[in-house]
């Protein structure tokens, strides 16, 4: 869905200030094959990212310190709740956990009945909205980040620019799903297309949850479903 040229335009895009609020989005992983990846956003502009492989206790401490360093309030931090992300819940009580399988979120009362026919789940909804943001060139990234090199399961010292170009392949429709709305390709299948776990791109698109939540995010229906 996202073409190579689409991402190159994002890489060269002018700074997208948005609301200017500092937020962070993360894909949780402890010591093992996958990377823990966390992005710093200012509005719709990516200002920084951190990639780590640490044990659970050390990672929690490191994330708390990084959020303070970045000036991100806990209520503006989202992370994937699935699996080991459950461990984070007790340490970040005010954060917005991203539950992949939660129901899609309606922005108005009128949308509540129809939204479930547009998207299979919350992750599919956010992935599609992120796709639109890229197509409309409404996000940007600090150019210096693109040359930073990272390693992971199946790749070694690869520039971020190349990693994101490879991982964009994870954002595609699951052709095996029924016709009921957009369903994102499952992660197992995405790994086959990408060649490794798409931790950078997944954590990138989680930021879209903030376009669906209000300040009192605990009241958003489906967001806290386990």
Regions found by a protein language model. Give the residues of each.
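RNase H-like, metal-dependent nuclease domains and their acidic two-metal-ion catalytic environment used
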Residues: 1-120, 124-128, 132-226
């Amino acid at each position: 869905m996202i073409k190579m040229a689409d991402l190159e335009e994002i890489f060269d895009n002018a700074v997208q200030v948005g609301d200017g609020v500092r937020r962070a989005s993360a894909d949780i992983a402890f010591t093992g094959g996958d990377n823990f990846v966390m992005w710093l956003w200012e509005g719709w502009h990516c200002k920084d990212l951190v990639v780590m492989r640490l044990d659970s206790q050390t990672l929690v401490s490191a994330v708390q310190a990084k959020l303070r360093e970045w000036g991100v309030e806990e209520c503006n931090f989202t992370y994937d709740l699935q699996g080991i992300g459950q461990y984070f819940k007790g340490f970040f009580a005010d954060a917005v956990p991203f539950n992949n399988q939660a129901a899609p979120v309606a922005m108005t009362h009128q949308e509540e009945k129809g939204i479930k026919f547009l998207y299979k789940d919350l992750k599919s909804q956010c992935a599609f909205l992120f796709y639109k943001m890229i197509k409309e060139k409404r996000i940007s990234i600090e150019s210096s980040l693109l040359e930073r090199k990272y390693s992971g399961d199946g790749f070694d010292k690869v520039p971020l620019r190349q990693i994101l170009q490879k991982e964009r392949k994870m954002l595609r429709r699951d052709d095996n799903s029924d016709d009921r709305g957009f369903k994102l390709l499952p992660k197992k299948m995405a790994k086959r297309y990408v060649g490794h776990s798409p931790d950078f791109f997944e954590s990138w698109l989680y930021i879209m949850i903030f376009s669906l939540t209000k300040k009192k995010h605990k009241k958003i229906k489906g967001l806290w479903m386990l």
